[in-house]
């Protein structure tokens, strides 16, 4: 059997190599999309639970609506807080690249060695403002 016809993980489409990183702008769009969907899901679940509680009057529905409200509040506050940090860093022209796989709340890195104290303060203040 020739080398070209041998089946290996690389030729099967499964590679053990590190995936190619997306450009910063594409990772920003991916993070915005993921966070937008998380916001939409949180608000939708809370609204559905609240509508159920209001129309049924069940204590279970009211309890679930309350739990959904706290969950939605936490998700919304976290996302706005992190985007505030990101906005503060970018306004100050900080070296703040997007993370390789922006799927969680944290969407960018801040390099303390490459940034000034003023850039750090701008990034820091952005979180509570968001």
Label the predicted regions.
Residues 2-53, 108-130:
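Metalloprotease/metallohydrolase-associated module, dominated by Zn2+-dependent proteases
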Residues 52-58, 89-91:
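Membrane-interface helix-loop junction between the first two transmembrane segments
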Residues 59-69:
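Hydrophobic alpha-helical transmembrane segments
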Residues 68-120:
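Small-residue-rich helix-interface/hinge motifs
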């Amino acid at each position: 059997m020739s080398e070209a016809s041998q089946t290996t993980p690389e030729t099967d489409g499964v590679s053990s190599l590190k995936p190619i990183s997306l450009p910063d702008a594409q990772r920003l769009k991916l993070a915005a999309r993921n966070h937008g969907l998380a916001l939409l899901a949180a608000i939708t679940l809370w609204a559905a639970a609240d509508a159920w509680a209001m129309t049924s009057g069940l204590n279970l529905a009211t309890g679930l609506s309350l739990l959904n409200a706290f969950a939605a509040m936490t998700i919304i506050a976290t996302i706005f807080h992190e985007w505030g940090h990101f906005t503060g860093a970018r306004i100050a022209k900080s070296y703040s690249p997007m993370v390789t796989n922006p799927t969680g709340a944290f969407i960018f890195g801040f390099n303390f060695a490459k940034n000034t104290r003023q850039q750090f303060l701008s990034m820091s203040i952005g979180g509570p403002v968001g």
